[in-house]
Amino acid sequence: MPSDFKFSVRAHQSITHKYKLQPVEEVLEAFERMKQICGKLNAEVMHLQVPSSFELTKTSIINLRNVLSSVSLQKLRLALEIRGVRSSQLPPELLNTMREYNIVHCTDLSRGEMPAYESDILYTRLFGKGKHNVYQPTDEELSEIDNEASSGKSEKIAMSFHFVRMYKDAARLKTYKQSGKFPMITRSTGLASLEEVLSEDARFPSAKQELIRSQGWKIFDLTETNRIHVGDLLGKLPEATYNDLGEVAERLKRVMR
C-alpha cells in the first residue's frame, strides 16, 4: 500500500450495540483490544457508531463519561456517530462530554448533516440521499460535499464512502480534486451512455416504475460535462411495461425530440 496510506478503524459493535457504551468489564476489555488494533495499524481515529435505537438519556451520557474516564486513549482520537439524530437535537450534556474528551462528531455530509461543532479533524461517512446506501451522487453533489468539508477550519478531512459504487465515486472526487474536472463514467454520452448503464443489471420485462426503483439511483453521462440520475430520464417514459432495453431507448428517443 502507499507509504502515506492512513487507516481508520471502526470499534467493535459489542461496545456500541450489545453493551451500549455501559462501563462494564466487557466494554473496557473490548476498548483495550481495539486500541491495540489501532496501534498495530497506526490508525489515528477509531470510529464509534451508536445505533439509532440508542437512547440519549442522562444515564447513557453518564455511562459514556465513565467509559471514557476508564480508558487511556493517549493519542487515539474517537469519532462518534449518533445514528438517526441530527446535530441540533444532541443534548448539551453529550456535546460537553464530547468536547471534553476531544471527540470528533461524525456525520453524513451527503445528507446535509454538519457536525455539531468544529474539530481539527472532520470525519464523515457518506451514504447518499437514497434508501440505505442505494445512491450515486452527481458531480454537483460531490462538489457540494467537498465544499462543505473544506469550509471549516479542520486540519484533516476523512471521507468514508458508502454509496453502492463507493470506490468509483471516491475516485471521481479524487480526480476532481487533482484536475478540477469530473471524469466521465461511461464510454459515451446521451442515450448510449444510459443504455450502457442499464445494460449492467436491468431486468426485462419491467414496468416504468420498477425501472425507476431499481435503476433510477444511478447516474449516466448526459454530456461529457454533465451527469444526471437515470431516474430523471426514465421519468419521461410513458407508463408501460417494457420488454427490453431497445424498447426503452426507442421510447426515450421520441420524448427527447
PLM ranges: what are they?
Residues 1-186:
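Residues lining hydrophobic/aromatic ligand-binding pockets adjacent to catalytic sites
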Residues 185-257:
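Charged, amphipathic alpha-helical regulatory modules used
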